[in-house]
Amino acid sequence: MASTEIMTINMGPQHPSTHGVLRLIVELDGEIIQKVTPHIGYLHRGIEKLSEHRTYHQTIPLTDRLDYLAPMSNNLGYVLAVEKLLGIDVPERAQVIRVIMAELTRLKSHLVWIACHALDIGAMTVFLYAFRERENIMDIYEMVSGARMTSNFFRVGGLSKDIPEGFTAAVREVLDTFPGHFDTYEGLLTKNTIWLQRTIGNGVISAEDAIDYGITGPALRGSGVDWDLRRDNPYSGYEKYDFKVPVGENCDTFDRYKVRLVEMRESVKIIRQALDSLKPGPVLADEPQICYPPKENVYNSIEGLIHHFKIASEGFSTPEGEVYQSVEAPKGELGYYLVSDGSTKPYRMRIRPPSFVNLQAIEKMAKGAMIADLVAVIGTLDIVLGEIDR
């Protein structure tokens, strides 16, 4: 039998299907993948180190730039960690609004995932539809925070401001359209022969291997592991909401696709419950040493102006200690480990980004597949390089 020679090719760091500046060194035997080695770091900005030289409030805008497709989920994990360190409680209204925005963020992120994943495999129509729907959520983002992507909306102790008039009506109007849109996506993909051929049996990783690799989020649930932090380690009042956690059976790309579709429907359900439970009240904790004063106080009294200036310039001190806080971000478990030395700045902040951990499983998932199927494996992991490189 004739011997074969292993061919090594570079995929990226500038390749449309890698969803960012990711370089993959792929070893091939013909068209069969023998090994995939990811090379990262092209988007490294030193966010963890930068946080050591900024006050706790000044670090919030840095978290926007981790998974830039899900900025409010990044904000949420960070402010929860600082609040745990301080031992303060957040008003009920602020918690409900946080849940609403976190689930809208999940919808927004999953819409980008299904759009790009479908486009990678050749389904362009879904790409156009999903980005059209995402635009409606971006409008809500702009309504509440003034920004479409880097929102900087959450604060230690609550929110930067209350939701504007007309917010709940705008959200309900958008939610009413989603069930029909999800049906459209399923109609275009779920029984599409080409889609089934490219996803069923592709990127298989067993539940045991997924746990060993530390995979979280839809990629873990697609392997049949019933684990979701919102239900199993709840935060921000998630224990009050009724929702289902979907899990897969066959541990492949198609199952991960089905899991995310169901997750989007469940997010709509959670947001509706949150809107129904929204009551009047403050959106910032009554902690003058930590939280910014109301804007009307800043504009109309010298005391309010001095109060604002002091917190903005000096920050607030935290007790010595360390905490770890994780949230169920759209891509998996996003964790913040904070170490405080009692000053106004973190002594150390370590971020556990889900994409960074999930990416390491790509060799296991792609080995033995055709080179043409590698783009489907990348898409099913739903990585973003902003949080991988940090």
UniProtKB/Swiss-Prot annotation:
- EC number(s)? 7.1.1.-
Membrane topology field = Peripheral membrane protein
Catalytically driven reaction(s): a quinone + NADH + 5 H(+)(in) = a quinol + NAD(+) + 4 H(+)(out)
Keyword Transport assigned: yes
Its Gene Ontology cellular component terms are: plasma membrane
**Subunit architecture:** NDH-1 is composed of 14 different subunits. Subunits NuoB, C, D, E, F, and G constitute the peripheral sector of the complex.
User: Could you tell me what this protein is called?
Assistant: NADH-quinone oxidoreductase subunit D
Give the species this sequence originates from: Geotalea uraniireducens (strain Rf4)
The encoding gene is nuoD
